[in-house]
């Protein structure tokens, strides 16, 4: 079971990250598809193990992908296109390592 949180900078629509909602793969992809590409919009997933993957819009078709690792006091990250982000969302639902599709760098918080 995967849970979702998001915030749309243009519309103000949100699911709070403190209370993410269980969401099917199709619904998650649909929510991401209608999310505005306004700077500051974000979308996040929490997998069944509590791992978080979040996408923050930087500008049209440019997203920062973050995979926080609190015990390492940092996050793995990359920049990706909207289409790549959709593929990464599918990876979470299909239990496929996102590292198969993107190279992630590590940075401290």
Q: Which residue stretches match the model-derived regions?
A:
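Mixed-charge, Lys/Arg-enriched low-complexity segments
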Residues: 73-109
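Intrinsically disordered, low-complexity regulatory segments enriched in Ser/Thr/Pro
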Residues: 2-11, 51-80
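Short glycine-rich, low-complexity/disordered patches
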Residues: 37-51, 97-109
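Short linear sequence motifs
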Residues: 12, 25, 35-36, 48, ...
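Short, solvent-exposed polar/charged micro-motifs at secondary-structure junctions
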Residues: 15-17, 52-56, 109
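Negatively charged, low-complexity tracts enriched in Asp/Glu with abundant Ser/Thr
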Residues: 1-47
